[in-house]
Amino acid sequence: MPIPDVIPILLATGNSDKQQAFRSLLNGLSFNPVTPAEIGVSASTTEDGATHEAIAIEKALAWSDAGSTLAIASDGGLVIPSLGSAWQSRHTRRFSGPDVNDSQRVDDLVELMEPFSGEERNASWAEALAIAYKGRLIASWELLGATGEIARTRPSGPIPEFWVFTIWNFPQLGKSYNQLTPEELLSLNDHWTRLSRLVRRFFQSIFVPPLD
């Protein structure tokens, strides 16, 4: 069903990089993306769900309820099979502890992977996305993206908020994930490319705009 008017949708994160990722997902659709800061809302979540999808749903429900609006939220993490139980993708950002900066997280993961070689260094990205309206879930997805490998050394220069993407390499392209062009991301059929298709299909074919 076509969306008749521009509808506000809350980007349920304070992370500017993720806000930009959400904007790219919604680009061309009849929505007005707004940030929590722009509408003056906040929400608290535990983020202790058993899956990325459960965590994304928790975020979407909390933020959509806090803002009394439509909200889109996500949760993701790096899947590193060789580390087994020593690594949980859900704790990618927090694996070094709560008070560690992104630069130290890069160093810690590089050190953790030092004993591994070849395919043992392979890693994929799991990403979940959820959409809710005023505390009610209306859609959610979780998928596993392309496979790259963990770099042996940290990159030079400042580390962005999505720190792990600076050491998640794609040797066939000679780049880390954060250096890939839109065309290269498309060629990899990466997680955001696939989520974009799902989101667009949902909003263009399934979504019924709220009446209140």
Name these PLM-found stretches:
Residues P2-L10, D17-D212:
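Anionic-ligand binding patches
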